[in-house]
UniProtKB/Swiss-Prot annotation:
Compartments where located: Cell membrane
Cross-referenced HAMAP family: NDH1_NuoC (MF_01357)
Oligomeric form and interacting partners: NDH-1 is composed of 14 different subunits. Subunits NuoB, C, D, E, F, and G constitute the peripheral sector of the complex.
Predominant location category: membrane
Biological function: NDH-1 shuttles electrons from NADH, via FMN and iron-sulfur (Fe-S) centers, to quinones in the respiratory chain. The immediate electron acceptor for the enzyme in this species is believed to be a menaquinone. Couples the redox reaction to proton translocation (for every two electrons transferred, four hydrogen ions are translocated across the cytoplasmic membrane), and thus conserves the redox energy in a proton gradient.
EC id: 7.1.1.-
Membrane recorded as keyword: yes
Top class in the EC scheme: translocase
Higher taxonomy: Bacteria, Bacillati, Actinomycetota, Actinomycetes, Mycobacteriales
Record-given protein name: NADH-quinone oxidoreductase subunit C
Native source organism of the sequence: Mycobacteroides abscessus (strain ATCC 19977 / DSM 44196 / CCUG 20993 / CIP 104536 / JCM 13569 / NCTC 13031 / TMC 1543 / L948)
Reaction catalysed by this enzyme: a quinone + NADH + 5 H(+)(in) = a quinol + NAD(+) + 4 H(+)(out)
UniProt keyword annotations, A-Z: Cell membrane, Membrane, NAD, Quinone, Translocase, Transport
Length: 228
């Protein structure tokens, strides 16, 4: 599937060293990596294949509703590596998801879960939640993506629209700290209830304990030598 011309990615920062380590604690033995951090930007029309049909129909469905328009709800549309991602404002996520599920020409009946992503350099949009959706009726797949700041990490839960997201939203809350408002039981699902922090954020400390081996003591990862 091919679409229109892809715009250059947006550079949001520079990665230095491996494993996302910042400042110190690089335990790789090599800290000379310098790599731009980039995110895809909105794609040009035509998107290709059924992508245009999905976006056009969603725009029409939202236009028929009283309290929201397509321009209000959708921040952008990205086609990257033959995948369609619709970026939605958090306050309109439930309405967009319900439109995608219920409209006969869209019929995205199934959510395959939700994944969290942490972009520390994406200012005021550091935490992203990505929902893969599938239309069994039309054999189509798209993704919804929402971005919120670390300072206010609230996203409406999609549990009422897609019950399959129940435990996935709990896991995303557990590991990334995204708070899914109106979730029926938003508690940690893998870490202990009293655990401090969210382990899959890129600024989460590596931690560890000293390890003794052949008479030598190896320091925890956070305290080892940096090779920069």
């Amino acid at each position: 599937m091919t679409g229109g011309e892809q715009k250059p990615n947006e550079i949001i920062g520079v990665r230095r060293g491996l494993f996302g380590v910042r400042g110190s604690g690089d335990t790789s033995g090599y800290g000379g990596l310098v790599q731009p951090i980039s995110l895809p930007v909105s794609s040009n029309r035509p998107y290709g294949g059924y992508f245009d049909q999905v976006v056009d129909r969603l725009e029409s469905v939202l236009a028929e509703q009283e309290n929201v328009t397509y321009a209000d709800a959708v921040e952008g549309v990205v086609v990257y590596r033959d995948q369609l991602t619709i970026h939605v404002k958090a306050e309109h996520l439930v309405q967009v998801a319900q439109s995608l599920r219920d409209d006969p020409q869209l019929r995205f009946e199934l959510s395959l879960g939700v994944s969290g992503v942490h972009y520390p350099d994406d200012s005021a949009r550091e935490l992203h939640a990505v929902y893969p959706l599938m239309s069994i009726t039309w054999n189509r797949r798209i993704m919804l993506e929402v971005a919120v700041p670390e300072s206010d990490p609230h996203i409406p839960s999609l549990n009422a629209v897609y019950p399959t997201t129940d435990w996935h939203e709990r896991e995303t809350y557990d590991f990334f700290g995204i708070i899914f408002d109106d979730h029926p039981a938003l508690t940690r699902i893998q870490m202990p209830d009293d655990w401090d922090g969210h382990p899959q954020r890129k600024d989460y400390p590596l931690g560890g304990v000293p390890v003794e081996y052949h008479g030598a003591t190896i320091a925890p990862p956070d305290q080892r030598r940096s090779y920069n």
